[in-house]
């Protein structure tokens, strides 16, 4: 039977969140999977963090499309901020301004697949896999199992090798088996408090006695895991920066100064790779609620926990405890995920040196299963597929229309005008 032309009918996706590929490679079952299948590492977009990367790997879309940028936000940036609380208070928010897009399970169900999606603890993994793989079916079926694991779990148990053996047996030679990860812990060299540095620059002004921020005289501040906000007059509760010319001047100064001036006091090394203007990263209808600037740290440097909530302390740099790791706010390459898969539609023994976007995982899996997709931020990774399959199943290169419609453009312009940007 020609599986490539008939189509795959069984798929199992083992989603291991928080795991490093290097820890998995030591397992013979993973080595066998890499020899028979394909592997690519997947980089997230700034701003990094578990929630943002969850959305990217499961939807194929950047969360900015539905108004999500970070899990920590200034209260004044929420659609309906609470009254009686300082608008600059940092609050937790895991949802966007709009509903998230359809996720992989929904996309498969819409295409006629039967989907079972479990999110479990590592202790439940083996029992869950046993239950899922004991059931045979004649329908197109995809089973997705997600759990969070770490290096210690791999070292002290045989759960993952056992789970992989069961999965390979269930999908057989004609199905798809994928091992997927959305994020891994990043080692920390130094924690950095950007707000301390902004205070030293005079961008943030503090009261000499209380040391509280004097907002009417503060030009910008850092929050969350990469957000740099201009304290804009007419938009923020106690805005200080006038729109247009003064706004542009403050942005230009921070974009140029932070990467060159903020340096590790011990080595003199730069700690910020780049400061992006929001227009460089985002272009959708929620541009109006994106951070004015986005900070990307160099590998090894992360925002201090205090700075993510607008805290100001004596030390700009703090040393982590031995072996300490973190995820949110790290350089994208340090918290990358990966896709490891084997299927009749995929190549054999292909491990890509170049990383792909984290958003390419969903279109790659869908294309391997011969499921049509639209409105993705990345196409499927062509180098992972067999030439024979690509010949009869070319990859969509128009993953989504990048241009806004006239109606969307008018909506964005109206919002920006209301906020004083134009």
Predicted segment positions?
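A short aromatic-rich beta-strand->coil structural motif
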Residues: 228, 295, 338-342, 365-369, ...
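Secreted, luminal/periplasmic, and some membrane-associated catalytic domains
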Residues: 7-9, 25-27, 31, 36-55, ...
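Short, solvent-exposed loop/turn segments at secondary-structure junctions
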Residues: 18-21, 47-48, 62-64, 121, ...
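Short, solvent-exposed turn/loop segments enriched in Gly/Ser/Thr/Pro and often Arg
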Residues: 40-61, 119, 148, 187, ...
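Low-complexity, glycine/alanine/valine/leucine- and proline-rich hydrophobic stretches
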Residues: 301-362, 367-370
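Short, hydrophobic/glycine-enriched beta-strand segments
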Residues: 10-17
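Long, internal low-complexity/basic segments
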Residues: 9, 355, 366, 378-422
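Active-site His/acidic residue clusters
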Residues: 123-163, 225, 233-237, 241-242
């Amino acid at each position: 039977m020609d599986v490539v032309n008939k189509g795959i009918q069984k798929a199992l996706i083992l989603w291991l969140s928080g795991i490093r590929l290097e820890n998995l490679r030591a397992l013979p079952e993973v080595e066998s999977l890499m020899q028979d299948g394909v592997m690519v590492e997947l980089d997230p977009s700034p701003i990094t963090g578990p929630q943002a990367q969850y959305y990217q790997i499961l939807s194929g879309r950047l969360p900015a499309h539905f108004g999500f940028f970070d899990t920590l936000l200034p209260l004044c940036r929420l659609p309906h901020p609470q009254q009686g609380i300082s608008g600059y208070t940092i609050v937790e928010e895991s949802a966007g301004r709009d509903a998230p897009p359809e996720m992989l399970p929904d996309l498969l169900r819409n295409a006629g697949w039967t989907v079972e999606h479990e999110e479990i603890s590592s202790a439940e993994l083996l029992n869950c896999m046993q239950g899922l793989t004991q059931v045979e079916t004649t329908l197109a079926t995809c089973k997705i199992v997600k759990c969070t694991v770490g290096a210690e779990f791999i070292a002290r148990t045989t759960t993952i090798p056992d789970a992989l053996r069961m999965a390979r047996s269930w999908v057989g030679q004609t199905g798809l088996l994928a091992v997927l990860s959305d994020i891994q812990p990043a080692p920390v060299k130094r924690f950095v408090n950007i707000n301390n540095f902004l205070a030293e620059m005079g961008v943030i002004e503090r009261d000499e006695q209380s040391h509280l921020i004097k907002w009417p005289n503060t030009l910008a501040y850092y929050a969350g895991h990469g957000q740099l906000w201009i304290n804009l007059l007419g938009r923020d509760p106690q805005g200080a920066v006038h729109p247009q010319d003064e706004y542009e001047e403050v942005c230009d100064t921070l974009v140029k100064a932070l990467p060159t001036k903020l340096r590790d006091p011990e080595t003199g090394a730069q700690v910020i790779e780049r400061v992006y203007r929001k227009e460089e990263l985002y272009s959708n209808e929620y541009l109006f609620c994106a951070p004015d600037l986005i900070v990307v740290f160099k590998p090894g440097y992360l925002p201090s926990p205090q700075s993510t909530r607008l805290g100001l302390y004596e030390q700009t740099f703090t040393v982590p405890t031995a072996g300490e790791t973190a995820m949110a706010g790290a350089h994208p390459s340090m918290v990358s995920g990966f896709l490891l898969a084997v299927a009749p539609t995929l190549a054999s023994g292909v491990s890509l040196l170049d990383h792909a976007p984290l958003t390419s995982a969903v279109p790659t899996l869908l294309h391997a299963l011969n499921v049509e997709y639209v409105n993705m931020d990345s196409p499927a990774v062509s180098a992972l597929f067999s030439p024979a399959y690509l010949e009869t199943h070319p990859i969509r290169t128009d993953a989504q229309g990048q241009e806004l419609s006239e109606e969307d453009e008018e909506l964005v312009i109206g919002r920006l005008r209301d906020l004083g940007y134009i």
